[in-house]
Each structure stands twice: as structure tokens, then as C-alpha cells.
Design a protein with these regions (language model features):
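Tandem CBS (Cystathionine beta-synthase) repeat/Bateman regulatory domains
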Residues: 1-144
Length: 144
């Protein structure tokens, strides 16, 4: 699901309009053991691994299968179909998310720097927001 970055005049909503701007991040030193602990939370579906602000991998549960607890996770994840651009057309991306059965996509700027996370609500109706994530974390007594 790789996307060409938008080069035309803006017509409708783009990914940046609805993305979570403050997603949880992991560094390249994050281990499989740590990742498994993070992913034990049923609201965490993917780990965004960055180095100096640049997205280097998106890691999902299935990427960790068979990996040793001390292994770094960034080597196990991938980008490609797990990433969209900030200026990508939201309607196109939303349709592709439905077709591919994806609820989470990392969002990067033109330089590959992480800009946020596009997160479809469990209901499939709309996208998660920073306020919604913060409220859920506060209600569960967990830090964001």
C-alpha cells in the first residue's frame, strides 16, 4: 500500500488532518521482551520505532514470533505497507485500509520523519484522536 506523496493542490482531507500527533514511540534499542510487554495492552497494535525522529520500522505482534527477548525490534519490523504520507488523500488511504484490513498506519513527512499515527477506531467509524487516546489512558489510570 505504498503511496505517492501528493503533489497536486489540496482537494479534500489529507491524512495529517486526522492523525494522532503524539503516538507512543520506541527507540532502536527497544528489545523484543520490552515490545511484548508494550503489546500486551490490547489498545497497542503497533510500535513505531524511530531514530533521531526518523521512522525506521513499524513493529506488529506477528513480527516478534520466534524472536529472542533480547533482540532489537527494529530489525524485525518493516515500513512499506505500514506507512503513509502526511499529504496523502484521506479518502484513498481510508479505502485502502478497509481493503487491507488495517487499522493503524504510521504517518511520515517527505523526509521520512515520523509525523504521527493514523488510527481507525475499533468501530470502523472515524479515526482516533489525541484527545480520545488521552482520555482513555486517564480513565485506565495509565500514562500516555
Amino acid at each position: 500500500m505504498p503511496h505517492e506523496l501528493a503533489t497536486q493542490a489540496r482537494v479534500g482531507p489529507v491524512v495529517a488532518d486526522v492523525m494522532i500527533r503524539y503516538p507512543k514511540l520506541c527507540g532502536t534499542d527497544t528489545t523484543v521482551g520490552q515490545a511484548r510487554a508494550y503489546l500486551a495492552d490490547d489498545h497497542v497494535h503497533a510500535l513505531l520505532v524511530t531514530h533521531d525522529g526518523v521512522l525506521v520500522a513499524v513493529v506488529e505482534r506477528e513480527d516478534l514470533t520466534g524472536a529472542a527477548p533480547e533482540e532489537p525490534i527494529w530489525l524485525l519490523g518493516r515500513l512499506g505497507d505500514r506507512v503513509v504520507g502526511v499529504d496523502d488523500d484521506l479518502a484513498v488511504v481510508s479505502r485502502e485500509m478497509n481493503e487491507w484490513g488495517r487499522r493503524r498506519l504510521a504517518v511520515v513527512d517527505r523526509g521520512g520523519r515520523l509525523a504521527g499515527l493514523l488510527c481507525r477506531k475499533r468501530s470502523g467509524q472515524g479515526f482516533c484522536s489525541d484527545d480520545g487516546v488521552a482520555a482513555r489512558a486517564a480513565g485506565r489510570g495509565r500514562p500516555m
